[in-house]
Amino acid sequence: MFVSTRRTFLKAAGAATVAAPCALAQTQAQAPKITTAQLGDNLYLLGGAGGNVVARTGADGVVLVDGGLAENADALAQAVAALPNGGPVRTLFNTHWHPEQTGSNEKLGMAGVTIIAQENTRLWLQQNITWPWNGRKFKKLAKVAQPNKTFYDKGTLDPGIRYGYISDAAHTDGDLYVYFPQQNILAVGDAAYGQGWPVVDWWTGGWIGGIVGGLQRIRSVANKETKIVPGVGPVLTYADIAAQLDMYGNIYDRLNQMINKGHSPSEAVAAKPAKEYEAKMGNPDEFIRRSFESLWAYLSPDA
């Protein structure tokens, strides 16, 4: 995690930027329509809750990877109950601390569900957080909603589920993956994006070099037939991950050269280091600015 001195150093840079719409899913005013698609035997992808949710059903209950936004928790619970062999939820994984992943924590925590997360995710959920670049505030979760089982490196829930730490700093500093070997499905949260540019949450440990490292980790866990479920957007292939790794690797190299030459975030944006990807990915300015700031955060941890 970042120390307070780093936050003081970076706060001015973040506050000076123009607030832009966050790439995280926006709150919906009315009850969402939860969609369901089968990924494999007893494995389903639920969409529309604020982020992708993976559900494994079975005689011993349901395992969820992520829980959508809090305002969609009831609708998601109804959709899960309607799945074949639905049953009660017994385990929830939080792939990281963002509200699109942790919105069902309180509802399920009150029901006695085991909530698993990487230890850094639990620590972030115990405190109030304000993003300095746009002022967005996140309240700490109630005790009952916080992960009640954490790990540092990796673990096994049962023979059909393995999980592990993606990287010490990727999208955040607490990203995890959940792998279903029998179906060859890998859920990775926002360590990979299915659409648009990712959020580089340097305030809670993410950085552009870590995004590259996280994709390398995902590729090492997967194989060429693996289906990869990102935090948002459609299911990805091994080839998609390789393409993302190439793209973010190129951008990281260019930004690293700029910061070593003393460029500012605005100069980095103006240099258009992601120009060849804009037609497919959209306007990268916010992503480039956050990525450049993340280099400051990572390279100057005690500034």
Regions found by a protein language model. Give the residues of each.
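Metallo-beta-lactamase
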Residues: 61-62, 69-71, 166-250, 254-257
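Short catalytic-loop micro-motif centered on adjacent basic/acidic residues
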Residues: 63-66, 91-94, 162-163
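Accessory terminal helices/loops
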Residues: 2, 17, 21-26, 220-227, ...
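Active-site HxH/HxHxD metal-binding segment of metal-dependent hydrolases
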Residues: 81-154
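C-terminal segment of N-terminal export signals and the immediately downstream linker at the start
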Residues: 21-47
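Conserved beta-strand hairpin/beta-sheet module of binuclear metal-dependent hydrolase folds
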Residues: 37-87, 177-190
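Divalent metal-coordination and catalytic microenvironments
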Residues: 42, 56, 66, 96, ...
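N-terminal secretory signal peptides and thylakoid transit peptides that target proteins
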Residues: 1-17
